A protein has these predicted regions:
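A cross-kingdom feature that marks ATP-driven nucleic-acid transaction machinery
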Residues: 1-81, 85-100, 105-107, 314-318, ...
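Residues in the helix-turn-helix
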Residues: 311
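Interdomain motor-coupling "hinge/lid" segment immediately C-terminal to the ATP-binding subdomain
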Residues: 39-41, 169-289
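Structural recognition of the conserved hydrophobic beta-strand(s) that form the central parallel beta-sheet
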Residues: 155-161, 182
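Helical "lid/switch" subdomain of P-loop NTPase nucleotide-binding domains
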Residues: 60, 133-136, 140, 162-166, ...
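A short alpha-helical element within helix-turn-helix/winged-helix DNA-binding domains
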Residues: 295, 300-305
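Conserved nucleotide-sensing/catalytic segment adjacent to the nucleotide-binding pocket
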Residues: 113-157
Length: 478
C-alpha cells in the first residue's frame, strides 16, 4: 500500500490515521462511509494508511495517467485485491487540482440512488468521476456515455473486478470510447520500494533484442544482489503477487488465500451470473487449477464432474471474466496450418493455482510455467503497445510455451523449472522460430529464443537462443 505522496486519496471516516505528508489533494467520496471528504468540490488533506503493507510502485501507473488525460473514459479492471483502488490514490499528477468524486457500487444504497437518476447524480462540478465495481451496475454506462459524449472535459474512470468488456452490454456501450487497462497482481519487478518501479530484464530485451541479453551475460549482478533477487523470485513464484500477502507469515497467507476463494464463491460470482451448485463449481475450480499449463478440454472436465460440457464452458467463462484463469490462444499464422487450435489454461496467480490444484497434484513444472505466464501477462499490461502473446504447438508435437510478437520482433520463450538449461533445450525454439519465419510471422523482424530457468547464469545455448534465469528476466535491471 502506498504512503502519501502526490496523490488523490481516500480517508476512512472511522479511523484517525496519521498523515505522512501534509496538504495533498484528496478524492472525495459521494457516500461510502469508509471515505471522508466534505461535500464541496474542494480537496481535503490526506491521511496515509497504517496497514503495514509497504508501498510498491505499480508499473501501470504512468500508462493509466496518460490514458486518463487522453480519453474521456478509462476502464481499469482486474481481480479483487490487486490494488485498483490503491492505484487511484496515486493516479493524478502532482499539483493537479481538478475536483473529483468517487462512487462505490459495492454500496447498495449508492446503487439505488444512482439508479433513480444516474445522469443528475453523475453530472455536477466534478471533472474526474470514479465508479468503483462498475460490473455491479452496468446500466450506468448509458449515463456515462451520454455525459462523455457532451465533450465538456469531464473524465470517467471505471474500476471493475471483472473483464467488463466481455459483457455484451458493456462492450456495445463503450465501443470506440474507452481506454482499456488491466491491473494484475504484483509483478516481480514491482517488489521494490521507491517512487517508481525500475525496468526489468525483459523490458531491455524487448527494446534491444539479443544485445541486451549479451550485456546481461557480460555484466552479472553482485553476489548480494543475486542472492536477494533469487530469494525474492523464489518467494514471489511460491506465494504470487497479491499485495496483501506480503507482510504475512506463511500460515496467515494460506488463510488469506482460502478466504479469498470463499469470498469469490460467496460474493463475486453473484456479479457474473447464477451458479446453482457452489460445491460443484468449487470442485471445477480444483480440477481446472490442477490442469494449469495444459490444453483445455471441456469434455474431460465435464466427465470428471459428471456434468454437461456447456456447464463446464459456463464455469470457465465465469473464471475467465473474473480474472481467476487465463486462456492462452495458439498462434495461427495461416488458416491451413496444421496446428493445435485448443487454448491452454493457466491460473492467473501461482499461489492460488498451488492451493486449488494441490489435492489433484499439479506438477512443479506446470506451476513454474504458470508463474512465467503470469509474469508475461503483467509485463504486457504495462506496455503502451502490448505485444501479442500466444503459444505454438503442432499436431506432430513441436511446441514452444510462449510467443511474444509484434510486427518487428518475435521472442519465443520456453519455461524450464530446472537450475540449468542444456543445448538440447534450444532445439524447439530454433525450429519454431524458423517455422514462423517460413510462415511469414517473423518476416524481417528480429527473432530471439529464451529458455527461462531457476538458475544463476545467463548463457548462450545456440545461435539466437539464450538461457536466462527467471529473476534476471523479470527482476530489475542493474
Amino acid at each position: 500500500m502506498p504512503d502519501a505522496r502526490s496523490i488523490w486519496s481516500f480517508m476512512p471516516r472511522t479511523a484517525s490515521w496519521p498523515s505522512r505528508s501534509p496538504s495533498l489533494p484528496q478524492l472525495r467520496s459521494s457516500s461510502d462511509p469508509r471515505w471522508s471528504c466534505k461535500y464541496s468540490l474542494k480537496f481535503c488533506s490526506i491521511a496515509a494508511n497504517t496497514t503495514g503493507v509497504g508501498f510498491h510502485p505499480r508499473r501501470l501507473l504512468a500508462l493509466l495517467r496518460a490514458r486518463l488525460a487522453a480519453r474521456p473514459i478509462t476502464v481499469l479492471t482486474g481481480a479483487r485485491q490487486t490494488g485498483k483502488t490503491t492505484i487511484v490514490r496515486d493516479l493524478l499528477p502532482a499539483g493537479g487540482d481538478l475536483p473529483s468524486v468517487y462512487f462505490s457500487l459495492d454500496d447498495p444504497d449508492e446503487r439505488l440512488r444512482l439508479a433513480a437518476d444516474p445522469v443528475r447524480r453523475l453530472d455536477h462540478g466534478a471533472r474526474i468521476v470514479v465508479l468503483d465495481e462498475i460490473q455491479k451496475q452496468p446500466a450506468l454506462l448509458d449515463a456515462v456515455k451520454l455525459l462523455a459524449d457532451r465533450g465538456e472535459g469531464r473524465r470517467f474512470l471505471l474500476l471493475g473486478s471483472a473483464q467488463v468488456l466481455l459483457l455484451r452490454q458493456v462492450r456495445e456501450t463503450l465501443a470506440g470510447r474507452a481506454a482499456l487497462l488491466e491491473l494484475w497482481p504484483l509483478g516481480l519487478v514491482e517488489r521494490v520500494e521507491g517512487p517508481e518501479a525500475p525496468l526489468s530484464g525483459l523490458d531491455q530485451i524487448w527494446r534491444e533484442g539479443e544485445a541486451a541479453v549479451r550485456r546481461m551475460a557480460e555484466s552479472p549482478p553482485s553476489a548480494d544482489d543475486a542472492r536477494l533477487w533469487r530469494g525474492r523470485a523464489e518467494e514471489h513464484f511460491l506465494w504470487g503477487g497479491y499485495p496483501a500477502l506480503e507482510p504475512m507469515p506463511p500460515e496467515e497467507r494460506r488463510a488469506w488465500l482460502r478466504d479469498f476463494r470463499r469470498t469469490y464463491l460467496g460474493r463475486d460470482l453473484a456479479d457474473l451470473g447464477r451458479v446453482a451448485d457452489l460445491d460443484q463449481f468449487a470442485l471445477a475450480q480444483n480440477l481446472l487449477a490442477a490442469r494449469t499449463g495444459q490444453l483445455l478440454s471441456h469434455s474431460e472436465v465435464a466427465r470428471e464432474l459428471g456434468v454437461a460440457v456447456n456447464t463446464v464452458k459456463r464455469y470457465v467463462r465465469f473464471l475467465e471474466i473474473s480474472y481467476q484463469l487465463f486462456l492462452l490462444r495458439p498462434l495461427q499464422p495461416t488458416v491451413t496450418a496444421r496446428l493445435v487450435k485448443s487454448p491452454k489454461l493457466y491460473w492467473t496467480d501461482p499461489a492460488l493455482a498451488r492451493l486449488l490444484g494441490e489435492r489433484a497434484g499439479a506438477a512443479d513444472g506446470a506451476l513454474f510455467e504458470t508463474a512465467i505466464l503470469d509474469e508475461l501477462l503483467r509485463w504486457a499490461s504495462w506496455q503502451p503497445e502490448p505485444p501479442a502473446l500466444h503459444f505454438f504447438r503442432t499436431h506432430a508435437g513441436r511446441e514452444v510455451d510462449f510467443i511474444l510478437h509484434a510486427p518487428d520482433r518475435v521472442v519465443a520463450i520456453e519455461a524450464k523449472s530446472s537450475e540449468r538449461a542444456h543445448r538440447t533445450d534450444a532445439r524447439p525454439l530454433t525450429e519454431v522460430l524458423g517455422a514462423l519465419t517460413m510462415r511469414g510471422v517473423a518476416g524481417d523482424a528480429w527473432r530471439l529464443g529464451l529458455v527461462v530457468t531457476r538458475g544463476r547464469e545467463v548463457e548462450p545455448l545456440a545461435p539466437g537462443v539464450w538461457a536466462v534465469p527467471d529473476w534476471r528476466l523479470f527482476g530489475p535491471v542493474g
